[in-house]
């Protein structure tokens, strides 16, 4: 029984569960999507909140440039490149034996400075927001001061009396541990069994305490939350419920708008933008999608991509039960090579906030992630970790879907021909060479 209902009855009410349970790659295009002007109210946050987050990151830019010299060229702003991947697009046409109209671009959060993943957005932002609250409250800086002062010894000594804790499959912990340690905080990262060893090693090299679990992500988060509870000197970064994380990710959208403008890419009803976002617990893709809907309204179509073994957000939103159900409830094992997406229970906050704003959800099996990883490297010379390829099949899923989604959304052949598809590459820039070689060898063996 699952929430008092037999699995057989769940399958009658929600027939797409059969494919999820059988681990078959599948998709579901959301029939409940609503106009963004109406559905954005579900989130409980607005454009002013995102603007406030953007301004905070600007205040911290001098400090980031001082602590991380690799960001000096961008003035301490942590941002990634947007690149067209036309050769990969051609390779996908051959791979899927389909026309795949439109243009294909890659957002390279995989190569963001500091931690090499999308988590350098939300994770670093939340730690900075917490540091600012402490610094303002204790008179270390004023809002108009040069925040690079927070790197001075007295400020570091102050932060050293405070702790930052987080539960993670890897990349969020990497971001929070590195920025926390750089500011002087005591940092502890509770890591699930899925976390890669090199990520644990890197954190320890930065002086971060790594607590390892033999169980999955949800247990690591719960243990981290429990350890932090009741300690006024510990700030727990709650990936399942944090609005600060969400806003840190949302800032990406206005910056993307500037990059699209610079590339001469129009986004409107006749030139739709499809953004394919890998999804774990949901905070990163949810925050980015929220920002995109604020920036582009109904001209942007956001889709979440998950591993077949960890389809937690698909399951939660499709059934309407959100965090009340886990993939394990239905016999899905939550074991995937896409370690950054190995989450069995979704964020209820994100699922409810975004359920009328997202166009759809789809799953990808691990072998396909490795094929696409090798195909991207072969065609464009770009190397990503498996999780980051989850969005790559999206252009084919949209083009070939049989559920009437394109007709419902007014996505005519002419509009699809004018479309821009953006694959959000979430991580991989810091994967050790030996590990990347193993990824590529597996992918090439599956392709050839």
Swiss-Prot record:
Domain of life: Bacteria
Signal sequence interval, chain numbering: none
GO terms (BP aspect): D-serine catabolic process; isoleucine biosynthetic process
An MF annotation (GO) of this entry: D-serine ammonia-lyase activity
Cofactor(s) named in the record: pyridoxal 5'-phosphate
InterPro entries, alphabetized: D_Ser_am_lyase (IPR011780), Ser/Thr_Dehydratase (IPR050147), Ser/Thr_deHydtase_PyrdxlP-BS (IPR000634), TrpB-like_PALP (IPR001926), TrpB-like_PALP_sf (IPR036052)
Sites bearing N6-(pyridoxal phosphate)lysine, chain numbering: 119
EC number(s) recorded for this UniProt protein: 4.3.1.18
Alphabetized UniProt keyword annotations: Lyase, Pyridoxal phosphate
Catalyzed reactions: D-serine = pyruvate + NH4(+)
Root EC class: lyase
PANTHER family tied to this protein: D-SERINE DEHYDRATASE (PTHR48078:SF9), THREONINE DEHYDRATASE, MITOCHONDRIAL-RELATED (PTHR48078)
Family according to the record: Belongs to the serine/threonine dehydratase family. DsdA subfamily.
HAMAP family named among the record's database cross-references: D_Ser_dehydrat
Protein name per UniProt: Probable D-serine dehydratase
Protein source organism: Pseudomonas aeruginosa (strain LESB58)
Organism lineage: Bacteria, Pseudomonadati, Pseudomonadota, Gammaproteobacteria, Pseudomonadales
Name of the gene: dsdA
């Amino acid at each position: 029984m699952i929430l008092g209902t037999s699995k057989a009855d769940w399958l009658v009410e929600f027939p797409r569960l059969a494919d999820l349970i059988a681990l078959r790659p599948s998709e579901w295009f959301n029939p409940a999507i609503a106009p963004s002007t109406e559905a954005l109210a579900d989130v409980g946050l607005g454009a002013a909140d995102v603007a406030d987050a953007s301004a905070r990151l600007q205040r911290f830019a001098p400090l980031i440039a001082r602590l991380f010299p690799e960001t000096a060229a961008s003035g301490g702003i942590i941002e990634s490149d947007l690149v067209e991947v036309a050769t990969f697009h051609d390779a996908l046409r051959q791979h899927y034996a389909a026309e795949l109209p439109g243009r294909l671009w890659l957002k390279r959060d995989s190569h963001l400075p500091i931690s090499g993943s999308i988590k350098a957005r939300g994770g670093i932002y939340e730690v900075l927001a917490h540091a600012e609250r402490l610094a303002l409250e204790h008179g270390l800086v004023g809002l108009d001061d040069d925040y690079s002062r927070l790197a001075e010894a007295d400020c570091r000594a102050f932060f050293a009396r405070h702790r930052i804790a987080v539960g993670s499959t890897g990349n969020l912990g990497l971001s929070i541990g590195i920025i926390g340690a750089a500011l002087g905080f005591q940092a502890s990262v509770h890591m699930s069994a899925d976390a890669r060893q090199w990520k644990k090693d890197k954190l320890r090299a930065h002086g971060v305490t790594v607590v390892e679990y033999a169980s999955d992500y949800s247990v690591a988060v719960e243990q981290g939350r429990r350890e932090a509870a009741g300690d006024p000197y510990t700030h727990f970064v709650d990936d399942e419920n944090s609005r600060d994380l969400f806003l840190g990710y949302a800032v990406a959208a206005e910056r993307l708008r500037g990059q699209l403008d610079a590339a001469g890419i129009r986004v409107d009803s006749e030139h739709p933008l499809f953004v394919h976002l890998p999804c774990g617990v949901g905070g990163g893709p949810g925050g980015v999608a929220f920002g995109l809907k604020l920036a582009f309204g109904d001209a942007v179509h956001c889709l979440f991509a998950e591993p077949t073994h960890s389809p937690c957000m698909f399951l939660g939103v499709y059934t309407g039960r959100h965090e009340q159900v886990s993939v394990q409830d239905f016999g899905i094992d939550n074991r995937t090579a896409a370690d950054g997406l190995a989450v069995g229970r979704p964020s209820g906050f994100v699922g409810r906030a975004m359920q009328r704003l997202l166009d759809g959800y789809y799953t990808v099996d691990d072998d396909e992630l490795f094929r696409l990883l090798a195909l991207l490297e072969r065609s464009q010379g770009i190397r990503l970790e498996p999780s980051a390829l989850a969005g790559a099949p999206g252009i084919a899923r949209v083009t070939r879907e049989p559920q009437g989604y394109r007709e419902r959304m007014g996505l005519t052949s002419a509009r699809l021909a004018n479309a821009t598809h953006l694959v959000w590459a979430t991580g991989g820039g810091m994967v050790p060479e030996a590990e990347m070689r193993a990824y590529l060898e597996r992918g090439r063996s599956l392709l050839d």
